[in-house]
Every structure is written in structure tokens, then in C-alpha cells.
């Protein structure tokens, strides 16, 4: 029942117990109270008996006291949605945090929604071109699909997601939503200013902006970090249903959603499961991921960065995420140590749509040939390490030389990394990517030095770089 009144009976960090006189609020209902003159939202997590509910706070609880009055809103957390959110930054409960006044939305939605029915879902497979060679060739993304960027600490997940925002969101005519889940506030701030510079956000005319931002960063309590992905998803769902177009939904980082869920679970006293994660890990992930889908009215293409703890892909958090994805881009520390960026592992990354029926026979064959050469090189590395290159057959020496060129040719300068590399970013059309790698595999460029293939765009740049290298050597 809405407007039922209760009183705070216990505060333990982010967990607040509230006692009601008669009607208990339902699980997931939002409760409002006041703390230090500001509104504090609590979400009901458990019914304890004796008319008491256990709740998780969506903001800091310092200063909250026993006996404080709490009001039941009668429903889940609701946030403003629609065009009024474009160009704005909101927190988990839909409050603006960009100091630009209130969000004047005509519509609001609850952040907990059921996934679309099977009959409403649509299945289509069309490639989403990113302009990044290694992705477009070996693990292409599908429109309306779910894409995961997996990697340990510091291998370039955020740089890659920023480049994808740069390449796709800027040329994408529809709307984008970015959810910053438990990541660095500095990165969130940088992204906002980058979007203003690139005209994706227009501060002078916010209604013409193409992106809405939702942040629940590292410094937030676990309740906020566990729900902010759902807040972003609710915005994306509304854009999909309203505009009927392809909406881009970026999440950085989905692991923090799981991590916050595990913190909340421990605070609620649940017995942990494997590696200390919450017993409801698969359910929490499934409920969220099933909402990110394409319906007959429109589609959501989601790109999610997934932190891999201690570089262990079998950790329950990344392993549970794998099951929901259409394409996985795995970033490897071994490749980043070679100085090859983006540090995408060409053999570990995969895509459901790398299929001749979808991408075409030529693309499929070139991708498989490239992977075949790289796989052969990988299997020869032990022999090279022990006996040296001289012990290899002539055919194997040629394979190794081509593999090293391919490995370097899969690198590419990024626009967003210009400050590190000093060179302008390059986007490569998919036709050029396929024809270039087809020629390299066929041996047409065996005469060029492998250094010419490093950090360039198309094959024309390789030839030009090789000529410059030859001129410098002369």
C-alpha cells in the first residue's frame, strides 16, 4: 500500500531495517526517508517477520538514525525516461547529477521490468560494422546482439569501449545509453566531456543530443552499483519502444554489477556460493540480460565490458556472463605485452554470426584462414623457443613470417588513444579488411617487412610505410 509509514529500527552500513505498523511493502518496493536534509531511497530486499523489512540503501547512510520516518512509495524505484534524459547524467534513482536542473520528463518507468515475451522477440542477423579490423574480421558484432569485452586489469577494455562509442555512436542515427557501473569517476567525467566535444551531447540544445548517461561509480554504496545497470537498461528499453530503432546500450563494467550483488548478498546474510559470489548469481545476471533483447518494435545492441578477476576466464562472474552473449571479444595480456593494441586475442574471441550464411563465404573463409595461420604459429612457438627458427621447415618458416605480419596487421591506431600513440585513429571499411587479409594470407605481401604492418589501417598504408622504411634505411 502506498504511503504506508514505518520507522527505522536498525542501520548497519548499507542495510537498513524498517518496521511498519500494519501493511508491509512488497519486495523491491522503494521506500523514501530523509537523511541530512536529502532524500534517501531504500529498496526492500527481505521480510524479516514482526512487521519488519530489511532494505538496501541507494546512497550513503551516514547520519541516518533509529526512529526516522520512512514512507512506502507503493512500487519499485521509478526514473524519468524519454527524450528529456538526452544529454543528461542521472544516478541510480533518476536524479540529475550534472548540475543542469531537474529532468523534465513526461513519463517515468520502474527499473524492474519483465523481459519481453518470446512472441514479441525478433531474430535477425546483420553485421554491425565497427571499423576495427580484428573485430570485423574475426568476431563480428551483430545488430541487436549482446557483445562482451573480456579482459583483466589494464588491458584496454575501457579504451576499446570508448573507441566503439566513438565509431558507432557518432555515426549511429538512433539513441545511445551509457551505464557507468562501479567504474572510475574520472573516466565518466572524461567520457562526458569527450561527448560534448564530438557533438554527441549538445549542452546548448540538450534535446538534440543522442546519448543519455547513467552513473553509479566506484564510490557509491553497493545498492546503487547493483541497480544502476537496470536504470540504464530501463532508459534503453523506453527508447527502443518509443523510437522503434536500434538503440546502443554500453555498460562499463558488468562485473561490478555482479560484485555489488555479491556485497548486497553478504550484507543480507545469505550463504555465499563458489568463490564467495552470491547464490543467486545466475538468476541476477539472467534477469538483467534477458531484458536486453530485440523486439518487433526495435532492438537494443548492448556492448558490455567484463572485468576478468586475475585473468581467470573460468571465474563464476565472467563465466556466467559468457552464456548470454552473441559475440565475445577477449583482450589478452600476452598480446598487450607485445605492444599490439587493441590487445584482442584472435583465437579466443568468437562470434555467433561468423557464419557463411550471414557474413558471406569470402569473409568466412578469410577469417578461418587467418585463424588457421595464427593457430599453427601458436603450436610452433614451443619448438622455436627450444630449438630456434633454424630447425623449422621452409613451409613452417613462411607460416611464422605470415603469422607475425597478420598479428601486427591486426593492430590499429584509435582516435581515443591519440594522446598515447600520437597518431590519428583509423577506421577501416570491412571490404578493405577482408581483401587486405586475403592478400596477406595468399602471400602477396611476403616481401614487405613485418614492421610495416604495425599500427596502420588498410594495406595501402602498409605499402606506404614500407616505402618510408626503405627510404630511411637507404
Swiss-Prot record:
Superkingdom classification of source: Bacteria
Membrane association type: Peripheral membrane protein
Residue ranges that the Swiss-Prot or TrEMBL entry lists as coiled coil: none
Keywords, alphabetical: ATP synthesis, ATP-binding, Cell inner membrane, Cell membrane, CF(1), Hydrogen ion transport, Ion transport, Membrane, Nucleotide-binding, Translocase, Transport
GO cellular component, one term: plasma membrane
Protein's cellular compartments: Cell inner membrane
Main location: membrane
GO molecular function, one term: proton-transporting ATP synthase activity, rotational mechanism
Signal sequence, start to end: none
Reactions mediated catalytically: ATP + H2O + 4 H(+)(in) = ADP + phosphate + 5 H(+)(out)
Residues reported to bind ATP: 151-158
Pfam families: ATP-synt_ab (PF00006), ATP-synt_ab_N (PF02874), ATP-synt_VA_C (PF22919)
Record-listed E.C. numbers: 7.1.2.2
Physiological role: Produces ATP from ADP in the presence of a proton gradient across the membrane. The catalytic sites are hosted primarily by the beta subunits.
PANTHER family from the UniProt entry: ATP SYNTHASE, ATP SYNTHASE SUBUNIT BETA, MITOCHONDRIAL
Family that this chain belongs to: Belongs to the ATPase alpha/beta chains family.
Complex and partners: F-type ATPases have 2 components, CF(1) - the catalytic core - and CF(0) - the membrane proton channel. CF(1) has five subunits: alpha(3), beta(3), gamma(1), delta(1), epsilon(1). CF(0) has four main subunits: a(1), b(1), b'(1) and c(9-12).
Protein's UniProt name: ATP synthase subunit beta 2
Organism this protein belongs to: Dinoroseobacter shibae (strain DSM 16493 / NCIMB 14021 / DFL 12)
Protein encoded by which gene: atpD2
Amino acid at each position: 500500500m502506498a504511503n504506508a509509514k514505518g520507522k527505522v529500527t536498525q542501520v548497519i552500513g548499507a542495510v537498513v531495517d524498517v518496521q511498519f505498523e500494519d501493511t508491509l511493502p512488497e519486495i523491491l518496493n522503494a521506500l523514501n526517508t530523509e537523511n541530512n536534509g536529502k532524500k534517501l531511497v531504500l529498496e526492500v530486499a527481505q521480510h524479516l517477520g514482526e512487521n519488519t523489512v530489511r532494505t538496501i540503501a541507494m546512497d550513503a547512510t551516514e547520519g541516518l538514525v533509529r526512529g526516522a520516518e520512512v514512507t512506502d512509495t507503493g512500487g519499485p524505484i521509478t526514473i524519468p525516461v524519454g527524450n528529456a534524459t538526452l544529454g543528461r547524467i542521472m544516478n541510480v534513482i533518476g536524479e540529475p547529477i550534472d548540475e543542469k536542473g531537474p529532468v523534465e520528463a513526461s513519463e517515468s518507468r520502474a527499473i524492474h521490468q519483465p523481459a519481453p515475451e518470446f512472441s514479441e522477440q525478433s531474430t535477425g542477423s546483420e553485421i554491425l560494422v565497427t571499423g576495427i579490423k580484428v573485430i570485423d574480421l574475426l568476431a563480428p558484432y551483430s545488430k541487436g546482439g549482446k557483445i562482451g569485452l573480456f579482459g583483466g586489469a589494464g588491458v584496454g577494455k575501457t579504451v576499446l569501449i570508448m573507441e566503439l562509442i566513438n565509431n558507432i555512436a557518432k555515426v549511429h542515427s538512433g539513441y545511445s545509453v551509457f551505464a557507468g557501473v562501479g567504474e572510475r569517476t574520472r573516466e565518466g567525467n572524461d567520457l562526458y566531456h569527450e561527448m560534448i566535444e564530438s557533438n554527441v551531447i549538445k549542452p546548448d540544445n540538450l534535446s538534440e543530443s543522442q546519448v543519455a548517461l547513467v552513473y553509479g561509480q566506484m564510490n557509491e554504496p553497493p545498492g546503487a552499483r547493483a541497480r544502476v545497470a537496470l536504470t540504464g537498461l530501463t532508459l534503453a528499453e523506453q527508447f527502443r519502444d518509443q523510437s522503434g530503432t536500434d538503440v546502443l546500450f554500453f555498460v562499463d563494467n558488468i562485473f561490478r554489477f555482479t560484485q555489488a550483488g555479491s556485497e548486497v548478498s553478504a550484507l543480507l546474510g545469505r550463504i555465499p556460493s563458489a568463490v564467495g559470489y552470491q547464490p543467486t548469481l545466475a538468476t541476477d545476471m539472467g534477469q538483467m540480460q534477458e531484458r536486453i533483447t530485440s523486439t518487433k518494435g526495435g532492438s537494443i545492441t548492448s556492448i558490455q565490458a567484463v572485468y576478468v578477476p586475475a585473468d581467470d576466464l573460468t571465474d563464476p562472474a565472467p563465466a556466467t556472463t559468457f552464456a548470454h552473449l552473441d559475440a565475445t571479444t577477449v583482450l589478452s595480456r600476452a598480446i598487450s605485452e607485445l605492444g599490439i593494441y587493441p590487445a584482442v586475442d584472435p583465437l579466443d574471441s568468437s562470434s555467433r554470426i561468423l557464419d557463411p550464411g550471414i557474413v558471406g563465404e569470402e569473409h568466412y573463409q578469410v577469417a578461418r584462414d587467418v585463424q588457421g595461420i595464427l593457430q599453427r604459429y601458436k603450436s610452433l612457438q614451443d619448438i622455436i623457443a627450444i630449438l630456434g627458427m633454424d630447425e623449422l621447415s621452409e613451409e613452417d618458416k613462411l607460416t611464422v613470417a605470415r603469422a607475425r605480419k597478420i598479428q601486427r596487421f591486426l593492430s590499429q591506431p584509435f582516435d581515443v588513444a591519440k594522446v598515447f600513440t600520437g597518431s590519428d585513429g583509423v577506421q577501416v571499411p570491412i571490404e578493405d579488411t577482408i581483401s587486405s587479409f586475403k592478400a596477406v594470407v595468399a602471400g602477396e605481401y611476403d616481401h614487405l617487412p613485418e614492421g610495416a604492418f604495425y599500427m596502420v589501417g588498410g594495406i595501402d598504408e602498409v605499402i606506404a610505410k614500407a616505402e618510408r622504411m626503405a627510404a630511411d634505411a637507404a
